Regions:
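C-terminal extensions
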Residues: 99, 103-165
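Intrinsically disordered, low-complexity Ser/Thr/Pro/Gly-rich regulatory segments
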Residues: 1-109, 120, 125-128
Length: 165
């Protein structure tokens, strides 16, 4: 209503239209704080007055979600609960958090691998690789991005350990 917004993910069915703000951080230990939750809620509040056409039908937003690969601060969780903002983080909520979703689906992102450097991870992203299983299906990808055979073997061992847990 007030300004133009981009939505990272939009999901809908017959009854709902959901806006998802996805926050990705690659710095270990970083937490999503209350400012992030406030920002997402403000965007949702601005957008919920607009009408969107998805699936050939005019719709109003019914829910706003914040999804992140980090943990939330206690204040962010308290605010989200108070304002009914759906939040999914590394360890929140207790059931259905990002860790559980990854483990239940078996869709482990390769970014969790400690045996790859940041530069190697960037190269994999640049060629469209996201999941450990993508590398498992085609281990040659690792040598294609510059790993030596022995390095690739170590990465494959880690993938085996990660994907079997």
């Amino acid at each position: 209503k007030c300004v133009a917004h981009e939505m990272d993910v939009v999901a809908w069915n017959d009854k709902e239209l959901i806006m998802v703000e996805a926050k990705f951080h690659n710095e270990f230990g970083l937490k999503s704080d209350v400012k992030v939750a406030l920002y997402v809620k403000a965007r949702f509040d601005d957008l919920k007055e607009s009408t969107f056409n998805y699936g050939g039908k005019d719709r109003k937003l019914t829910d706003g979600w914040l999804v992140t690969n980090t943990k939330f601060t206690e204040q962010a969780i308290a605010y989200g609960a108070c304002r009914k903002l759906t939040m999914i983080g590394w360890n929140y909520p207790l059931k259905g958090n990002l860790l559980h979703l990854i483990e239940d689906s078996g869709l482990h992102p390769f970014t969790c691998l400690a045996t790859l450097t940041s530069n190697q991870k960037r190269k994999l992203l640049d060629i469209g690789i996201i999941l450990c299983r993508d590398i498992s299906k085609n281990p040659k990808i690792l040598t294609d991005i510059g790993l030596k055979e022995d390095e690739a073997k170590i990465v494959m061992e880690e993938i085996g350990n990660v994907c079997s847990s």
